[in-house]
UniProtKB/Swiss-Prot annotation:
Its EC number is 2.4.1.21. Keywords: Glycogen biosynthesis, Glycosyltransferase, Transferase. GO terms for molecular function: alpha-1,4-glucan glucosyltransferase (ADP-glucose donor) activity; alpha-1,4-glucan glucosyltransferase (UDP-glucose donor) activity. It catalyses: [(1->4)-alpha-D-glucosyl](n) + ADP-alpha-D-glucose = [(1->4)-alpha-D-glucosyl](n+1) + ADP + H(+). It is an enzyme of class 2 (transferase). Synthesizes alpha-1,4-glucan chains using ADP-glucose. Pfam families: Glyco_transf_5, Glycos_transf_1. It comes from Nitrosospira multiformis (strain ATCC 25196 / NCIMB 11849 / C 71). HAMAP family: Glycogen_synth. Belongs to the glycosyltransferase 1 family. Bacterial/plant glycogen synthase subfamily. Pathway: Glycan biosynthesis; glycogen biosynthesis. This is Glycogen synthase.
Length: 496
């Protein structure tokens, strides 16, 4: 028996502007709750640094003051509090909260005012997050705890690697994680001096970005390593258009970029999902048929166990490929097939999808908005899940679908290509096939994949294999955390 591998102890400072469920606005909030917990369960000492918004301060008990920071540059004085997340396994992960009422105690969201406009002092608000993160990751820290790695997320903590670069003492290795490259934290050139950065940093080989200064570019330029949320997306962002203007820098740093697919929450599990009509597992798939009938009945479709039912839960946008879907709906219905869609987005696409549904009663249903229970029922009740996205950094629904025995049909981009194995004779034979992938972004290619899916659906042994192959995939956060640990250890070895 091989002894379990032992790893060096790792201290990690995880910096984020949001965390589920206290102040989540998007996917980063989910990651910030789940990944530190998974890292902690691998034996790392992880501490989360976050601004002290009202939702954070009001949602946490037993807060203790552990440090104070004097005013400097344009930053007001701030107090550092410690607490622990009050829910689930995440309660094992300590939180450091920056209490600075002048910057953070406001109505509205983390980034915008109650009217949805960006706070005008966001550069200072997130500059302070970065500055304190850098202090805690350096030998200037007032704490006894010193991280080996500082894990930065998106532009809001992008200045941490820059501050560390210009600090001459001992400091942690820095990791910059891109969740959304489109948001770049761009501000006026004057911001450089306001944030206490040297004027020499305002350069193409520094924080300068098309005449302004960019927090994200600062992070990407000065960090020790870059991670994004899938291997394919890591390659795609090195060229236009998916580089969003950063492709030159990213291609120069290609040897320092890694793609790690996000994990998914344990709540997406057909064995114990409370939203389903009937729970089921890989050992007993009979509940899937019951959920299909419940979905058909609830949405006014003809209840038929044999017709292939395609499902989608998404923002209804051009980026998500819904203009392509519109062009093949008639052929899908004529197969014959059924289609259910849940989501909201661009008005034109919403209206056209609703019109198509009215034209195909009993065969197509569209629900505008979001409904958690229905989203889970679609994953369980559909036979095949559609994701024709033009680009998709990671994607989650294609992973949910596989857990529910619902083979996904996807466009081969980003995380979709990394998490779905196209059904071919070879992939069926070696047991890796989990869905259907089309590569050309055309209605014809999409329809071709759809026809392949229908042919496989009608071959019950093949479809059964596809379902089961998907259900055994490991999309856990533990798998993602294990990949992050490899990066951390590599950075530590480079620092020595």
């Amino acid at each position: 028996m091989t002894p379990a591998q032992s790893y060096p102890h790792l201290d990690v400072l995880f910096i984020t502007p949001e965390i589920h469920p206290l102040n989540k606005t998007g996917g980063l909030g989910e990651v910030s709750a789940a990944l530190p917990t998974a890292l902690s369960e691998l034996g790392m000492d992880v501490r989360i640094l976050i601004p002290g918004y009202p939702q954070i301060l009001n949602g946490l008990k037993n807060k203790q003051k552990i440090a104070e920071f004097a005013a400097q540059s344009s930053f007001p004085a701030a107090t550092l509090l410690s607490a622990r997340l009050p829910f689930g396994a995440s309660g094992n992960v300590p939180l450091f909260i920056i209490d600075c009422p002048e910057l953070y105690r406001r109505d509205g969201g983390p980034y915008t005012d109650p009217q949805g406009h960006n706070w005008p002092d966001n550069a200072i608000r997130f500059g302070l997050l970065s500055k304190i993160g850098a202090i805690l990751a350096s030998d200037a820290s007032p704490l006894d705890w010193h991280p080996d790695v500082v894990h930065c997320n998106d532009w809001q903590s992008g200045l941490v690697p820059a501050y560390l670069h210009f600090h001459k003492g001992t400091k942690a290795a820095s990791l910059m994680v891109i969740h959304n490259l489109a948001f770049q934290g761009v501000f006026s050139p004057e911001t450089v001096s306001q944030l206490g950065l040297p004027q020499t940093s305002f350069h193409t080989e520094g924080v300068e970005y098309y005449g302004g200064m960019s927090f994200l570019k600062a992070g990407l330029y000065y960090c020790d390593h870059i991670v994004t949320v899938s291997p394919t997306y890591a390659r795609e962002i090195q060229v236009a258009p998916l580089g969003f203007g950063m492709e030159g820098l990213l291609s120069l740093r290609h040897e320092h970029i890694t793609g790690i697919v996000n994990g998914i929450s344990d709540e997406w599990n057909p064995v114990n999902d409370p939203h389903l009509e009937q729970n089921y597992s890989m050992d007993d798939l009979s509940g899937k048929v019951i959920n299909k009938a419940a979905l058909q009945q609830q949405l006014g479709l003809t209840v038929d166990p044999d017709v292939p039912l395609f499902g989608a839960v998404s923002r209804l946008t051009y980026q998500k490929g819904y203009d392509l879907l519109l062009r093949i709906i008639t052929q899908l219905i004529d197969i014959p097939g059924q289609l259910v869609i849940l989501g909201s987005g661009e008005t034109m696409l919403e209206q056209e999808l609703m019109r198509m549904a009215r034209n195909h009663p009993g065969k197509m249903a569209v629900r505008i908005g979001f409904d958690e229970k229905l989203a889970h029922l679609i994953e369980a009740g559909a036979d095949c899940f559609l994701m024709p996205s033009r680009f998709e950094p990671c994607g989650l629904n294609q992973m949910y679908s596989q857990c529910y025995g619902t083979p996904p049909l996807v466009h081969g981009t980003g995380g979709l290509l990394d998490t779905v194995v196209d059904c071919t004779a070879e992939s069926l034979a070696d047991g890796t096939a989990t869905g259907f992938v089309f590569h050309e972004l055309t209605p014809e290619a999409f329809l071709g994949a759809l026809e392949r899916a229908v042919a496989a659906y009608r071959d019950k042994p093949v479809w059964d294999r596809l379902m089961r192959n998907g259900m055994v995939q490991d999309f856990s956060w533990r798998a993602s955390a294990t990949d992050y640990r490899k990066i951390y250890l590599s950075l530590l070895n480079q620092k020595r």
